[in-house]
Regions:
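Secretory targeting and sorting signals
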Residues: 1-28
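Active-site-proximal segment of zinc-dependent metalloprotease catalytic domains
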Residues: 29-39, 72, 76, 81-239, ...
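Glycine-aliphatic tripeptides that mark coil-to-beta-strand junctions in extracellular
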Residues: 40-48, 58-64, 316-320, 331-333
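Short mixed-charge
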Residues: 45, 53-71, 108-112
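Disulfide-stabilized cysteine-rich extracellular repeat microdomains
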Residues: 50-51, 247
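Acidic (Asp/Glu-rich) catalytic motifs at the cytosolic membrane interface
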Residues: 262
Length: 379
């Protein structure tokens, strides 16, 4: 049997004291218990939850059995429950690719390993490997509108309340808010997102579409923006699926392969007031190709490695060093700053986690046991 949580032990002793016949009024119970939980691996899931399971309401019964689900207190874990509309759930091959993006991440752990273990829960739909008992199909709705309200309603009806502190919730849907956006994460960071590359807007989603969009939206939950630490999109030195240039087609590697994860390098910044074409992305661009915007609004992509000179202003040469160019196409002149995403993930968005932050637990007044007075009144 697992050790009982401390709060349960306190309530039990109070109840025993009451039943022992004390006529003194019980001391008022403080209404909030704040616990700074130990989180050795920094994934926002306290060691106690990852070791013993999570008891959401302090009744001594584990509600989310984290160790049985594969959690490790010394390695970063992410849990994602996936609900889905008919035909929209990603394939097993796509889910395998998502897992691989995280398992191969350049993130170190206290147990000496690298990578993040992502636990995807599709219920029974994709076999035991992706079944943690939570994911399920929901009614088809080709337009979640308004998206936040309708997503929250589906979450409330299809996601166990006790999971809120552990699992991110996502939905494989069709479209939302009358538009054709590929997805939505509602907040940065957050605990909820939707992937909406469905039939209504003729996405004809492939595994690539689903993998790129899932990883992108989850990235918002993990604190990442379209420019890394800022919202500037299409920065050629930001080699991440968080960049719209690479969400659906992958980050382009110079060896011809594609990468479907978050950036693991931070190439040199580019000053659009006087970008140095001869420098390309600098030495950290060697393993990549990249894309940027020309003055005519069209996207151009390097044919070779991005540490080579790049024609940022699209005038046919790669020798300009003092000519302004709007390289990310946003009609402003900025310094384009990249980010190493993996070094900047925020765990514990929304309601997820206890982590190193003091966490307000359920008020003890809501866990109130039967009082002696009430017990006597029953007879
Ligand atoms: Ca942890
Ligand atoms: Ca962990
Ligand atoms: Ca040029
Ligand atoms: Ca610009
Ligand atoms: Zn986005």
């Amino acid at each position: 049997m697992r050790p009982r949580p401390a709060l349960f032990a306190v309530l039990t002793s109070l109840a025993v004291a009451a039943l022992a016949g004390s006529h003194a009024a019980a001391a008022p119970v403080t209404d909030t218990t704040v616990v700074a939980a130990t989180d050795t691996d920094g994934d926002s899931l306290p060691d106690a939850w990852e070791t013993n399971g999570y008891d959401a309401n302090g009744d001594g019964v584990v509600d989310v059995d984290l160790p049985a689900m594969g959690a490790n207190p010394k390695k970063k874990d992410l849990f994602v429950e996936m609900d889905y509309m008919s035909g929209r759930l990603a394939s097993t091959a796509a889910l395998d690719r998502i897992v691989q993006v995280f398992s191969t991440a350049p993130v170190s752990n206290p147990d000496g390993s690298t990578g993040i273990t992502i636990h995807l829960d599709a219920g029974a739909a994709r076999g035991t490997k992706y079944d943690l008992g939570g994911g399920n199909e929901v009614a088809y709705d080709d337009d979640l509108n308004p998206s936040a309200t309708q997503t929250n309603a589906l979450k409330a009806a299809n996601f166990a309340t006790a999971r809120k502190a552990v699992f991110h919730y996502m939905l494989w849907g069709d479209s939302y808010d009358g538009g054709c956006s590929s997805g939505q994460a509602f907040n940065i960071p957050n605990d909820t997102f939707i992937v909406t590359v469905g039939q209504k807007c003729n996405w004809n989603a492939t595994d690539d579409t689903n993998v790129g969009t899932f990883v992108h939206e989850l990235g918002h939950n993990l604190g990442l923006q379209h420019g890394g630490a800022d919202g500037l999109n299409y920065k050629p030195n930001y080699l991440s699926v968080m960049n719209y240039s690479f969400q659906l087609g992958g980050v382009l590697k110079s060896d011809g392969t594609k990468y479907w994860g978050y950036s693991n390098v931070q190439p040199t910044s580019i000053n659009e007031a006087r970008p140095d074409e001869t420098a390309g992305l600098g030495s950290l661009g060697a393993g990549y190709r990249t894309s940027w915007k020309c003055p005519d609004g069209k996207t151009r992509t390097t044919t070779g490695a991005a540490n080579q000179p790049i024609d940022w202003n699209c005038d046919g040469d790669t020798s300009d060093t003092t000519t302004a160019a709007d390289i990310n196409g946003d009609k402003t002149t900025s310094v384009l700053i990249a980010q190493n995403n993996w070094a900047n993930l925020v765990f514990g968005g929304g309601a997820v986690g206890g982590g190193t932050e003091p966490r307000t637990k359920t008020p003890a007044s809501e866990l109130r046991e039967l009082t002696h007075e009430e017990a006597l009144a029953l007879h």
